[in-house]
């Protein structure tokens, strides 16, 4: 096996592992970005905890062939394609949306977002996906809503006791003054 072939096999294996591991996959068309813009975008993804890589479409398709359930993505591996892998559905969308707003280029454009088995290839999908709350935010909201009745109960129980304590204190103060 030649070194070139071995390197390709390694890349296919790596992409396949990521496609299998991550529930969130974004494919973008990065055509028209300068090297500086591409590096800036990579840095933003890295800061957000999103893996982002450019790979040959042929190698990505070969990796897809080894994975069940994600073969519908194959048609989107045409033209310049970059892949963003994430655990959070909103992070890649927010990075892309912020980049698009700041750079005003119209690139990179979203080809498709694969969110735990559902595909979003509509151009407006990016706005919707960017508004999604992260898993941690949703868990925090649920916990907050579960704790709210208990906090209200504690406040309700403390209220009369505090009023009674205040009344007794004012009576004691009046007796001292007399």
Swiss-Prot record:
Alphabetical list of Gene3D superfamilies matching this protein: 3.30.70.1730, 6.10.250.290
Record-linked CDD domains: Ribosomal_L10
Disulfide topology: none
The keyword Lipoprotein belongs to this UniProt entry's keyword annotation: no
Pfam families, alphabetized: Ribosomal_L10
SUPFAM superfamilies in the cross-refs: Ribosomal protein L10-like
Keywords from the UniProt entry: Ribonucleoprotein, Ribosomal protein, RNA-binding, rRNA-binding
MF terms (GO), sorted A to Z: large ribosomal subunit rRNA binding; structural constituent of ribosome
A Gene Ontology biological process term: translation
Record bears the keyword rRNA-binding: yes
Highest taxon of source: Bacteria
GO cellular component labels: large ribosomal subunit
PANTHER family in UniProt: 39S RIBOSOMAL PROTEIN L10, MITOCHONDRIAL
Matching NCBIfam families: PRK00099.1-1 (NF000955)
Family statement drawn from the similarity comment of this UniProt entry: Belongs to the universal ribosomal protein uL10 family.
Function of the protein: Forms part of the ribosomal stalk, playing a central role in the interaction of the ribosome with GTP-bound translation factors.
Subunit structure: Part of the ribosomal stalk of the 50S ribosomal subunit. The N-terminus interacts with L11 and the large rRNA to form the base of the stalk. The C-terminus forms an elongated spine to which L12 dimers bind in a sequential fashion forming a multimeric L10(L12)X complex.
HAMAP family associated with the record: Ribosomal_uL10
Protein name: Large ribosomal subunit protein uL10
Organism: Salinibacter ruber (strain DSM 13855 / M31)
Source lineage: Bacteria, Pseudomonadati, Rhodothermota, Rhodothermia, Rhodothermales
Gene: rplJ
């Amino acid at each position: 096996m030649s070194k070139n072939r071995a390197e390709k096999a390694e890349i296919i294996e790596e992409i396949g592992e990521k496609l299998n591991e991550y529930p969130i996959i974004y494919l973008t068309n990065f055509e028209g970005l300068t090297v500086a813009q591409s590096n800036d975008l990579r840095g933003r993804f890295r800061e957000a905890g999103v893996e982002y890589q450019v790979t040959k479409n042929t190698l990505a398709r070969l990796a897809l062939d080894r994975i069940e359930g994600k073969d519908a993505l194959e048609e989107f591996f045409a033209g310049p394609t970059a892949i963003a892998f994430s655990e959070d559905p909103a992070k890649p969308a927010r990075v892309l949306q912020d980049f698009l707003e700041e750079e005003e280029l119209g690139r990179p454009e979203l080809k498709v977002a694969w969110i735990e088995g559902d595909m979003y290839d509509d151009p407006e999908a990016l706005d919707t996906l960017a508004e999604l709350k992260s898993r941690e935010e949703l868990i925090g909201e649920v916990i907050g809503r579960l704790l709210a009745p208990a906090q209200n109960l504690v406040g309700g129980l403390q209220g009369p006791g505090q009023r009674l304590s205040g009344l007794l204190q004012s009576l004691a103060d009046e007796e001292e003054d007399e």
